[in-house]
Amino acid sequence: MTSSTPRNEELFDRARQLMPGGVNSPVRAFGSVGGTPRFMVSAKGPYLMDADGNEYVDLVCSWGPALLGHAHPAVLDAVHAAVDRGLSFGASTPDEANLAEIVMERVPAVERLRMVSTGTEATMTAVRLARGFTGRNLIIKFAGCYHGHLDGLLAAAGSGVATLALPGSAGVTEATAAETLVLPYNDLAAVKEAFATHGSNIAAVITEAAPANMGVVTPGEGFNLGLSRITREHGALLIVDEVLTGFRTGYSGYWGLTGGAPDATDPWTPDLLTFGKVIGGGMPTAALGGRADVMDYLAPTGPVYQAGTLSGNPVAMAAGVATLTHATRDVYSYIDVRSLELSSALSSALDAAGVDHSIQFAGNLFSVAFGTSAHGVHNYADAQGQEAFRYAPFFHSMLESGVYLPPSVFEAWFLSAAHDDAAMNRIFDALPAAAKAAAAAQG
């Protein structure tokens, strides 16, 4: 049991005097589930430890980067060696090219790569690049898809925006918002209509490879392929955001499981992709890449400006190289099996408690949506229409049993290569009580 949290409470009280809401990223405040956020002080393998000494099996995994488990020895060794050489040089380093080569080998759609520091910076640069390359202004995004907190893409965004039930963000000007067309996800007819009306001024369509920020939503059959065909027909670019799914859902990301798979019956290729999370191995780094002719529009070879003091930071590059080097196909196969085991156990527990639900998948990522078994979740409207009130009691029951879940129903669950039988059994043991708590919840 983890009900004793006096130190966490003290830390949160102090943090609220120093930082907006006491956090540096809104979802950490437990706003949609209530209670005291946990302040973590250490992590090892599949486990987290909070400031009160409570241990949790971790199903957040740093929102994806801890693919190998926390504090993996090879990653720590690489980071320690890099730190010994210096933290930042303001110049290029060998591991930038080493990491780029690994990404390009795994994702053949990437012909050039630019390192940045955050996923938001990657998508921001991709959008600017698309506008510069095409000479057009409008961007199509999909309701519920989250692409970081750049102004033009916050309308009807998922992730923390969905968690806080916000339509977008204050501070985004009408002029900026007017350059973004927000369409329903999984609706190719709406995309075709938008191009019929605005096609000559649409620079790009940006989409998550598989959305995981309104809960996990599987792209409908032919949806991503259709986006590729429509954009090419109209001279626009397709930007596929794999900040979350890249090298997390599979060896080559979600694109590698679908349109880029060797046995794909209907292959499709994005013009640009964005990456983050896993490629930094827990350190802050991200990247954008894609067609050489498009990427070469970036400075210094082209007129689209992008720069960053810490882009390609040597410590982050070392962590990324070590993580992807050890993220073998066997690692993904192992996580795939664990994901199926956990999702099956979750569904069985909810069924036994009489809780209507559906479980949504994107590779080894999944999430649960309550009250949706009849139709599943195909877009943002479906996600918002679920019985979200059942998640908070479910979450807190799991937390009390020592399992740390995402503190929002709109986020994916993550497993790692370090989740062994002992860790999985602790999760399985906690599920029946949590399912009963969800069943008893009143909306």
From Swiss-Prot:
Main location (coarse class): cytoplasm
GO molecular-function terms, A-Z: glutamate-1-semialdehyde 2,1-aminomutase activity; pyridoxal phosphate binding; transaminase activity
Keyword tags: Cytoplasm, Isomerase, Porphyrin biosynthesis, Pyridoxal phosphate
Cofactor(s) of this protein: pyridoxal 5'-phosphate
Pathway stated in the Swiss-Prot or TrEMBL entry: Porphyrin-containing compound metabolism; protoporphyrin-IX biosynthesis; 5-aminolevulinate from L-glutamyl-tRNA(Glu): step 2/2
Family: Belongs to the class-III pyridoxal-phosphate-dependent aminotransferase family. HemL subfamily.
Protein's name in the database: Glutamate-1-semialdehyde 2,1-aminomutase
Organism of this sequence: Pseudarthrobacter chlorophenolicus (strain ATCC 700700 / DSM 12829 / CIP 107037 / JCM 12360 / KCTC 9906 / NCIMB 13794 / A6)
